Amino acid sequence: MAAVKKHLRFALVAAITIALLVAGSVADESSEDIDNIVIKTPLDIPRCDSPLCSLFRIGLCGDKCFCVPLPIVGICVPSV
């Protein structure tokens, strides 16, 4: 049970890190257009159909999310 919690905690940290990296790369590309800043709230971010996914079963996350592979399972991350 402790190993599962450890992997889920790692998955959450990985998802947050990836989301921040994606947001940072998007911000770097559009730094010239300061008038077009859009701040997304949790209500604007799409919900995934499932929190966990597998690369062997495509489509578990839904249309607006993608699967981030981890050592055992993957996690669904919203496409922002």
UniProtKB/Swiss-Prot annotation:
Tissues expressing the protein: Expressed in trichomes, that are stiff epidermal hairs located on the surface of petioles and leaves. Not expressed in other aerial parts.
Keyword annotations of the record: Disulfide bond, Ion channel impairing toxin, Knottin, Neurotoxin, Plant defense, Secreted, Signal, Toxin, Voltage-gated sodium channel impairing toxin
Propeptide, residue positions: 28-44
Disulfide linkage: 48-65, 53-67, 61-76
Entry similarity comment: Belongs to the gympietide family.
Domain notes: The presence of a 'disulfide through disulfide knot' structurally defines this protein as a knottin.
Protein name as annotated: Moroidotoxin A
Organism in which the protein naturally occurs: Dendrocnide moroides
